[in-house]
Amino acid sequence: MADIPRNLYMHFPFCRGKCSYCALYSRGAVALSERKAYSAKMADALSKLSARGAKFSTVYFGGGSPALCDLDAVLSSLAPCLEIDAEVSVELHPLDVKKPLLDMLRSEGVNRISMGVESLDNATLRDMGRRYSLNEAKDAFFTVREFFDNAGIDLIVGYPRVGNAEEWKIEKLADWGITHCSVYSLQLEEESSLASREGIESSLPGDDEVMDSLKNIGEFLESISLERYEISNWARKGRECRHNSAVWAGEDYLGLGTGAYSRVALRRMRGAWGVDGEGAEEVSVVSEEDDIKERLLFRLRTRKGLDASFCPRWKETLEKFVAEGVLSSAGDIYRLTPRGMEICDYVLAALV
């Protein structure tokens, strides 16, 4: 039997409706009975892990919208599996934010909230299919802050311009009191409804415009004491997402539920309901070399950088990037410079 990782991701695929840019597996308009059955299956998987002595240092409830499921039952089964100081994060859609839910989450051990805001412009929010206004998102976040002092948001940049959209100003976040912010560049996924729109390619902002937006966002976030600790993530000191940081550091993680990914030693699984691959949709085994490469490349995305002593054949390429000002080095530790952050995908591709 496999050792159980200390990091757990649980996927809840149900959502209020498919967003225009989303190509992830998700299901909308599902009956309550089906959502309850899914929650019961998740709770049962946790009970089995508990019986095997599982102890998790980080737990992440992702989706979809986890709040559409019976989180009370899931959290009750999770409790015996938590280390004393475990980080337990839950993703919330602004329309799911209600005080009774937040009170239950807090009482059951949740200590971190990530809310998907996605845009600071009402016209763009409507076009995305997000179903709330910026003011509604702000009110929801302020309600979250009444219960949690560790709360952040997600944003997307690079979305097509929408009609006479209001100006997208990051400064609108000045009084929100966020402790964390994830900022992702739009990836036009073939399976998304956005990709099927006529002329969509011509309406996308150019790379330079997206880079300028990311630069402005980063400068603003740093002005309110959020530090960039990964390519797409900023946080107040001590408020970094421990779960994602563990994954980027190369630690193993177990993913439970439809569409969830796991990395357990050399095994990679998708859609498993247990550490031994119970019910998995996919299971594969990678080579030791590919395993090391994957874990090291994740580390390069963070401010901690990667230790090239684990992969000496990269040394020449890494030194080339140092000479170009894309990387900095201290011994065998290599880190992306601010310029390197802008072209991270190019750097990673050169090392694969």
Predicted regions and their residues:
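C-terminal scaffold of the Radical SAM
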Residues: 5-7, 24-49, 57-310
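Basic, glycine-rich polyanion-binding accessory segments appended to enzymes
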Residues: 277-345, 349
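Flexible, acidic/Gly-rich N-terminal and inter-domain linker regions that tether
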Residues: 1-9, 17, 56, 324
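Local cysteine-cluster metal-coordination motifs and their immediate loop/turn environment
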Residues: 11-26
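Beta-strand-connecting loop/turn residues
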Residues: 15, 179, 252, 332-333
